[in-house]
A protein has these predicted regions:
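A conserved mid-protein helix/loop that constitutes part of the nucleotide-sugar donor-binding site
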Residues: 21-32, 193, 197-219, 233-236
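Short hydrophobic beta-strand element within catalytic cores of glycosyltransferases
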Residues: 45, 291-295
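Short His-centered aromatic/hydrophobic patch
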Residues: 76, 97-103, 122
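A conserved, positively charged/aromatic
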Residues: 111-146
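A short, active-site helix/loop in glycosyltransferases that binds the activated sugar's phosphate group
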Residues: 139-162, 169-173
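Nucleotide-activated donor-binding/catalytic signature segment of Leloir-type glycosyltransferases, i.e.
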Residues: 239-255
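Acidic donor-binding loop of glycosyltransferase active sites
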Residues: 265-277, 290
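Conserved acidic donor-binding segment of nucleotide-sugar-dependent glycosyltransferases
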Residues: 306-307, 311-318, 327-332
């Protein structure tokens, strides 16, 4: 049997420590696509936690933890720079960052590795001038949707440097964890209905809307429990507000969950209260037939066809968010119709070929 050719190019992917849904799943798929295309793949995680780094390491990828805290800090940036320089990346090689916080880190790498191609993938529209400044120093910006591309243009990123490539709907396989086992592990009642939201605990996720909706749903539906998966600087504020609104017994918050692929297939609904790439768990949930409800955002409009695969609700009045969730939970036929349509739509709108397009774009 002939020996496999040695990889001729190296890609360093830079991301937060994530779980295998949303952007985390996209990173797993991208790593596999680069390896299949003959690239040597290194992945650097700039925050602690998350199951994706361990999953990538188990799959044979060179995985590097450059952080010990749940947020990107100066120490992680310094370690990332040192590690990136140790790879001696040259002209054929590439750096691919995932998300806006990582795009800002990339600005520190640009002057130190000027010969490597720098690409930044964004799943949510950039908002601030600092991010725009960093993106303008990249060779390529991979926008996950037309709305993201427009946001880049608003920050004066040249159109010639922006390519729009939608995410790929290819959920991580379940590991065979049963509902009863999940209930024991997560402290849930197996006989209740479960909902799932995956979001960073940051202001843009607008999690106060989620808490208000949980509070309102508790009045009309007593057999509901809610799982929120996310880490970030808003955690203490969120938990304090949950206690004030007396929803703590129904809300289960975890910074990370390695069992998300199994949990995703057991929930009654996935929902999202703010602007989160891939809708958090919405894209993956729709691909396995879970109805979705989200407050209007660029990601929601990309993932959900309102009235066909789930519901998109306005931010005001606030009552619309829990009302639409309740309507699906109480109508099995409606939920089944949304589930079937969601699976068909994600297969057509977010095909597996997207990762090949990503590799080609990064390669130049």
């Amino acid at each position: 049997m002939p020996a496999m050719p040695q990889p001729s190019r190296t890609v360093l992917m830079v991301s937060r420590g994530l779980d295998p849904v949303g952007t985390g799943r996209q990173i797993e798929l991208a790593a596999a696509a680069f390896r299949d295309a003959g690239w040597r793949v290194h992945v650097a995680a700039t925050t602690a936690g998350g199951a994706v780094p361990e999953r990538l390491a188990a799959a044979g990828f060179a995985m590097h933890r450059v952080a010990t805290r749940p947020v990107v800090d100066a120490a992680a940036a310094v370690r990332l720079v040192r590690f990136a320089r140790s790879l001696r990346l040259e002209g054929p090689d590439a750096i691919l960052t995932w998300g806006r916080s990582q795009a800002r880190l990339a600005a520190a790498l640009r002057p130190l590795l000027p010969r490597a191609r720098l690409a930044c993938q964004l799943g949510s529209p950039p908002r601030d001038r600092l991010t725009g400044w960093c993106l303008r120093r990249a060779d390529l910006v991979v926008a996950g949707s037309p709305a993201v591309a427009r946001g880049c243009g608003d920050l004066h990123v040249a159109d010639t440097r922006v390519v729009t490539i939608p995410p790929t709907a290819d959920p991580a396989a379940a590991a065979g964890v049963t509902r009863a086992e999940l209930a024991v592990r997560l402290g849930l009642d197996p006989d209740t209905l479960w909902t799932l939201c995956v979001a960073p605990l940051e202001a843009e996720a607008r999690l106060e809307r989620l808490l208000w909706a949980i509070d309102q749903l508790g009045v009309v539906h007593r057999r509901l429990e809610h799982v929120l998966v996310g880490a970030g600087p808003q955690r203490q504020r969120l938990m304090r507000r949950a206690r004030m609104q007396q929803v703590g017994e129904r809300l289960h918050v975890f910074p990370h969950l390695d069992c998300l692929p199994d949990l995703l297939r057991q929930v009654a609904i996935v929902w999202q209260s703010g602007e989160v790439a891939c809708g958090g768990a919405i894209l993956d949930g729709q691909a396995v037939g879970i109805p979705a409800v989200a407050v209007d955002s660029a990601a929601a409009r990309q993932c959900i066809v309102d009235g066909e695969t789930g519901r998109i609700v306005p931010a005001d009045p606030e009552s619309e968010f829990p009302r639409r969730v309740f309507g699906i939970l109480e109508d099995d036929a409606l939920a089944a119709r949304y589930a079937t349509a969601a699976q068909h739509r994600t297969a057509a709108a977010f095909p597996a070929g997207g990762m090949a397009a990503l590799v080609a774009a990064v390669a130049g």
